[in-house]
Amino acid sequence: RHDIQKNADGSWTANGHMPLEDLVQYVPLPLDEKREYHTIAGLLMEYLQRIPQPGEEVQVGDYLLKTLQIENHRVQKVQLIPLRDEEELDFEV
């Protein structure tokens, strides 16, 4: 999928419009079943209650979500940075 790619440092870079249902197949983020948002951009805006600025970071579960690129008030690119080594993260559902 071109919506997300793994970086050499173990982080991920994803499109802001990537559906969260697809994202969690790569990155184990905790999602609220009652959420009103369906994309990474929506998740960031829900946490911040506004449009994020480039470079702004939000912690979600064991990941730091860093806004990389904004165009026309839309989140285009987000970096997902694991806060712990992947070996420590439990991927079992």
What is each of the regions a protein language model found here?
Residues 1-93:
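Cytosolic regulatory modules rich in charged/polar residues
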